[in-house]
A protein has these predicted regions:
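Short Gly/Ser/Thr- and Asp/Glu-enriched loop/turn motifs at secondary-structure junctions
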Residues: 61-65, 101-104, 244-248, 299-303
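Catalytic palm subdomain of template-directed nucleic-acid polymerases
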Residues: 68-85, 114, 160
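Long, highly charged, low-complexity intrinsically disordered interaction regions
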Residues: 80-143, 305
């Protein structure tokens, strides 16, 4: 499971294999769908565009979340939240939660409360008022605060910090010395002091990962190399899309972790590239060689991962005046490759090691139709 609606969260854990929770989901009437990233991405863009049309500034934080700057807006902010929620629901059919507060961290808590108490809040909570803010802080466990993970929760609870209110009242400098500046900023934000600015332009990623489960267990090296080549090509597309190059990559493969009767194996290889690059051909060749080094026969492999690291803008690697750089011909080739795939669809042109319809691809028997992204799957109205 890679995503859950709020109502489904009590019945399934993030990352839990579907076969382990299938019966429980059916028992509670929870419907599961296979991943359809094209549809989700398109619907996300529609939701974000609608929100951006109603606020002065907006930061798209993830595929299903954004922050909006309401500075300068006069009138009832709660009503504005209701209007945003109603417009998104009317135009996309997607219900959203709206949290309004003076800092990002408080807005996350308000949003969480809006969804947790949906029948009372209508999906909108404004905690700009100190009394409402304090009520939410007192009734929120510290583990539910944005950026506080399980390990951090254990340390904080050992210090007597069990609620968001406890964290807001904790000494910021002590938190900084004991943990990090991140925890200090979180506490200050909970107390109402803004520490996190709105980022209207998303900063370039520091690493790019492409990882997938195989549709079936693989035992031979050849199909595993095909899968790694496929994931490398996708990661390289993302790399070029943000205008970056990489100097290192890590390739890893592993067996299933939820079958106690099977032998387990997991290994990865770190690859130093000859020069900073975003060339799919060079990256695929390096990834294929790495897989050959870490593959061991006799195991049933279930997943592969490609991680691109040391990301920079072209020209930022200046440690050696005479260092090799990516040939101009490679830049031109990748530009043409992206233009063709952008015009005719992803995968129209690809490396020869990437199959068109692999039998190891992800199983998507329960995938919803691509109603908004494919002309042959439009919703039919009779």
């Amino acid at each position: 499971m890679i995503a859950r609606s709020y109502d489904a969260k009590p019945f399934v854990k993030m990352g839990e294999p579907y076969f382990q929770c299938r019966d429980k989901l059916r028992q509670h009437g929870v419907v599961a769908f296979s991943s359809n990233y094209a549809l989700y991405g398109d619907m996300s863009e529609r939701v974000m565009s609608l929100i951006e049309s109603m606020v002065p500034a907006c930061e798209v934080y993830s595929i299903d979340e954004c922050f909006a700057d309401l500075t300068g807006i006069a009138g009832d902010l709660t009503q504005l939240g209701r209007d945003v929620r109603a417009k998104v629901l009317r135009c996309t059919g997607i219900p959203v939660g709206v949290g309004i507060a003076r800092t990002k961290t408080l807005a996350k808590l308000a949003n969480h409360t809006a969804k947790r108490l949906l029948s009372h809040t209508g999906g909108v909570v404004d905690i700009c008022d100190p009394f409402k803010r304090d009520w939410v802080l007192r009734n929120t466990q510290v583990k539910e605060v944005w950026g506080i993970g399980k390990r951090m929760t254990a340390y904080l609870e050992a210090m007597g910090i069990r609620t968001a209110m406890d964290l807001a009242k904790a000494d910021p400098w002590t938190l900084r010395q004991t943990f990090s500046v991140v925890v200090e900023k979180t506490a200050r934000e909970l107390a109402g002091t803004p520490c996190l600015e709105l980022e209207e332009a998303a900063p370039p990623k520091q690493a790019i990962c492409c990882s997938r489960m195989f549709g079936k267990r693989l035992t031979e090296l050849a199909p595993i190399k095909q899968a790694v080549a496929t994931y490398t090509g996708r990661a390289a597309e993302k790399l070029r899309d943000q205008g970056s190059v990489c100097k290192r990559m890590r390739v890893s493969i592993r067996t299933g972790m939820f079958n106690p009767g099977e032998a387990r194996y997991a290994e990865g290889a770190l690859v130093e590239l000859p020069y900073p690059t975003n060339d799919t051909l060079l990256l695929t060749r390096a990834a294929s060689e790495a897989v050959g080094q870490i593959y061991r026969p006799g195991f049933r492999y279930s997943k592969a991962e490609v991680l691109l690291m040391d990301l920079r803008r072209p020209g930022e690697f200046s440690g050696d005046l005479f260092a090799i750089t990516q040939p101009v011909a490679c830049d031109r080739l990748m530009t043409v490759l992206d233009e063709i795939n952008g015009k005719y669809g992803r995968g129209t042109m690809r490396t020869a090691s990437v199959p068109h319809a692999p039998d190891w691809g992800m199983r998507r028997e329960m995938m919803s139709r691509s109603y908004t992204t494919r002309i042959d799957q439009l919703w039919r109205v009779h």
